[in-house]
């Protein structure tokens, strides 16, 4: 099967509190042969801005991320599993974890919630049947998916995505200093390829995830702005780009571990069109 070919028999599995244990058992088996994990999250937007003086634009971007991730809760996590050839496991390839979220008690940006609601996210069900993040973290830590150098993470403009995962896994606020954030990131996720960061070496590729997918002639499975579908599309985009622009080989020294808009990837945040990182935080990808 060619890399990133769409097969409509691939299924996205919805995970709630009631089936979390069973699905994590399945994932422990899947990760053994399918060690590329494409990831996306849905979260309730941006509600705060950091105040004070900042050493650089990069520092401001991290502090913006930190204050919002500390204040807010993750809503969904999508994980798609693929192998070195970009092939999916038989049956289910994508797991969409739905976390406990309460519109009455939890903070959010109104426009983000409206977007997610229109995308089909069922907030009443999240309130009643959502996964507790601390229990998820316990299972995830022993799943073979994190803390493993053999697992390769694929993402798209993913500072916030990894921010929420680190917050869940450490059960604490994010570090005050960006360098400490990247040290924790490398511990949990030793190998990361951010597709948006890779795009700087891909002539004519531009825009958010949906726009990039259309340029690569990829067909989405499932609804946009849901984490499962977005993670699946991210994985497809990575393998198509690797084939088209990188001759099926990514230079780890140049690309591995860089997140678009943070740290060494921060110089690509602003290209004359305003603050791209805040746009991503509001899920305009």
UniProtKB/Swiss-Prot annotation:
Q: Name one GO cellular component term.
A: CCR4-NOT core complex
Query: Could you mention a single GO BP entry for this protein?
Result: positive regulation of nuclear-transcribed mRNA poly(A) tail shortening
In terms of superkingdom, the source organism counts as Eukaryota
* Cofactor note text: Binds 2 divalent metal cations per subunit with RNAase activity being higher in presence of Mn(2+) than of Mg(2+) or Co(2+).
Q: Which PANTHER family match?
A: CCR4-NOT TRANSCRIPTION COMPLEX SUBUNIT
Task: State whether it acts alone or in a complex, and with which partners, per the record.
Answer: Component of the CCR4-NOT complex.
Q: What is this protein called?
A: CCR4-NOT transcription complex subunit 7
